[in-house]
Amino acid sequence: MTASKSTETLPGDNTNTWSGRFDEPVSELVQRYTASVGFDKRLAEYDIQGSLAHARMLAAGGIIGPHDLDAIERGLSQIRQEIQGGGFVWQLALEDVHLNIEKRLTALIGDAGKRLHTARSRNDQVATDIRLYLRASIDRITALIHAMQKALLHLAEQHVDTVMPGFTHLQVAQPIVFGHHLIAYFEMLKRDVERLADCRKRVNKLPLGAAALAGTSYSVDRAMVAQELGFEGVCENSLDAVSDRDFAIEFCAAAALIMTHLSRLSEELILWMSPPFGFIDLADRFCTGSSIMPQKKNPDVPELVRGKTGRVNGHLVALLTLMKAQPLAYNKDNQEDKEPLFDTVDTLTDTLRIYADMMAGIRVKETAMREAAKRGYATATDLADYLTKKGLPFREAHEAVAQAVRFAEKNNRDLSALTLPELQQFSPLIEDDIFTVLTLEGSLNSRNHIGGTAPVQVAAAIRRAREWLSATPAAQ
């Protein structure tokens, strides 16, 4: 939606909808302090959708007349066009998106505009707007996660046989294939998609009809409004309907996990791109240079993903803190829910958009990966397993191999480079067939089970992942 014009017009007379209760107008400072239109105007489209559904329900129930409905529909259509075209004038004095639209509607159609708010409060109105906004955001984000997953699978398919070291404690542990490593992130994002889908179920309930907190004395048809707006049902307690922000907190928690997964991948990209690793190179469009060191190519995008993850985590804590001491029902504190939520959506959306493209621009240095897998005695566990299969208790095999590693390290050689007599001094069970076991390919192929790093299993995992993507819609 195109950004609309913004003004900070502060009329001299008090034009608030609730001014009849007060002897003096709100001060200019308080108006600025309490206004939310600067950020909640992004809810305008959802506010219009909710108002149209509400008006149609009022007309169907005979609460407003058909001529009122026709005028409201025409007026809201014009307002939508003004907002999309950037010609709508937002007034700070009108406080929020709801009153700005209502005042403009009344100016366009007269008394019919004043009847729109019948059987409705801004409390249930804003709760509805946020849920509509978040539902649409979840669908867009889910589609972006799928794009990221496809990028991971595309890269993994190219590297089913590319050997690299697997790490624990950032120390070389065992050989794996690069495709296997990438699928680990696919699985993380798969859980993220499932969490978002589960969160969406709780987002997709209609608060409208709860009014301020106790419901309304009008005979409203909440089911009709829910059906028109695509909600699966209605919030069943009016107090909870207007005060609940669990769904926003739950989304932010899911978003924080997604960002955490991307941050972990970012850390690895940064490490892999550094000269001590030299496993990959990122496309130039995702990097910057140094103002003083001409040789530098800095992985700015992955670094910013790490940094922005802290930002999203902070928004989650902000929302939890916002809600922790509020009595029922609605309180003005809840105005502070929108900026953390909006920024979480924006940050996550931008991160996912850029990440899929960044994965497509990765150049893998296969030789460097393979050479690194040869270092650090990555096949030591295979030697221990070999001895165990020969009948030696695993703990004894572990000790024998540890001594063999010390010997090899002292002589600056890999286990596979030791002679048979040298190996047999640590266990007489070792025979000629050990040298097949100690190769990188031998180690990889021995992990031939679901979830293992054997190339044949990695290829099967990629097929299963593509089947899951095909069966999982991006939008519910």
From Swiss-Prot:
Pathway: Amino-acid biosynthesis; L-arginine biosynthesis; L-arginine from L-ornithine and carbamoyl phosphate: step 3/3. It catalyses: 2-(N(omega)-L-arginino)succinate = fumarate + L-arginine. One of its GO terms (cellular component) is cytosol. Its EC number is 4.3.2.1. GO terms for molecular function: argininosuccinate lyase activity. Keywords: Amino-acid biosynthesis, Arginine biosynthesis, Cytoplasm, Lyase. GO terms for biological process: arginine biosynthetic process via ornithine; L-arginine biosynthetic process. It is found in: Cytoplasm. It holds the Pfam family ASL_C2. It is an enzyme of class 4 (lyase). Its main location: cytoplasm. Belongs to the lyase 1 family. Argininosuccinate lyase subfamily. PANTHER family: ARGININOSUCCINATE LYASE (PTHR43814:SF1). This is Argininosuccinate lyase. The gene is argH.
